[in-house]
Structure formats: structure tokens, C-alpha cells
């Protein structure tokens, strides 16, 4: 399912998905319309914009994750947004988004994120305040390790825009993505 308030983006993403041989594509112009569609149909993957009115991508994600319909709750959500600030990335991740892409989106990057949620799905967890993909991306560290890391690392200012590879590292640190593979030499090296 493609959810975006821009008819152009819906058409563009739909065309890219059809190029990937996806045939059953539904479209919605905001989160409320998408939820209505999902009453009768459960998407395999949701491509979602952030800023839409009256119901934005974060509200939609929270609604899906808190749904009492089992299958629907587990649908992978890939947020596609023109915003790349650190606070937004964290906000989307904490709402239950599986992956995050920054516009403009290339077919290669979209394919990479779709492939990531299919080939490397994260287990879902439930806490008192969260249901969604496990946000723990690394081994759990001790308090002493965390304090040392905090001294060694310079935090990213919340308003600073991030590059797509930095966003990928937040969602999947230490893993290699299919789109990263293209940067490596292929075939015999001389």
C-alpha cells in the first residue's frame, strides 16, 4: 500500500512497485483513508509519507501497531519523507516504523529497504508503551559501557539533517544492505 498526500508521489511509487512486479497495490491520500482500506485488506508492506493531514504517518503507524487485528499489526512500514532530522528519525523508529527513506527516493534505495524488511524481518516486541519491531539494534551494553561510549561519541544535534546512510545505520547498525553492495568491487580483482 502507498500512502501519500501527493498524487504525484503515489503514482511514482506505484510505477516503481509495478516495475518490481508488484501487482496488488492500493493507494491512500492520508492515514485515515489507509486505515479504512485496511478494514477489508491487509497489505504486505506499507510505504508511508510522514506529513499528511488530517492523519499523518506517525499517527497511522501508532494506530496500526495498536490495532487488535493481529496480521495488520505486523505489516512492515517503510516511512518515506522529505525530512531527515535526527529527532524525526528517532520519532518514527519509536512509533514502530521498520525502515526510513529520505526523498527523493531512487528505485534502488526503495528496493533495498523492501528487501531488508522481507529478508531480515525484526522480531516484534510488546512493552507497556510500545508494540512494534524490536528497536534494540545492538548487543545490550552494561551501564559502564554506555557511559564510556557517551564520553567517546559526539551526539548528533536533534535538528541536524542526516544522510540516508546515517539513517540506515540507526535502523540497522552493523548490517550490510543490498544497496551498499553496489559500492564494493564485483568479480575478480587485479
What are the language-model segments listed below?
Residues 7-26:
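Two-component/phosphorelay signaling modules centered on CheY-like receiver
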Residues 14, 59, 73, 84-99, ...:
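Alpha4 helix (beta4-alpha4-beta5 surface) of REC/receiver domains from two-component response regulators
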Residues 27-36, 57:
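Helix N-cap/capping motif at the beta->alpha junctions
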Residues 41-47:
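Active-site beta3 strand of CheY-like receiver
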Residues 53-54, 85, 103:
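The feature encodes the CheY-like receiver
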Residues 105-118, 122, 126-127:
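C-terminal output helix
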Residues 119-189:
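CheY-like receiver
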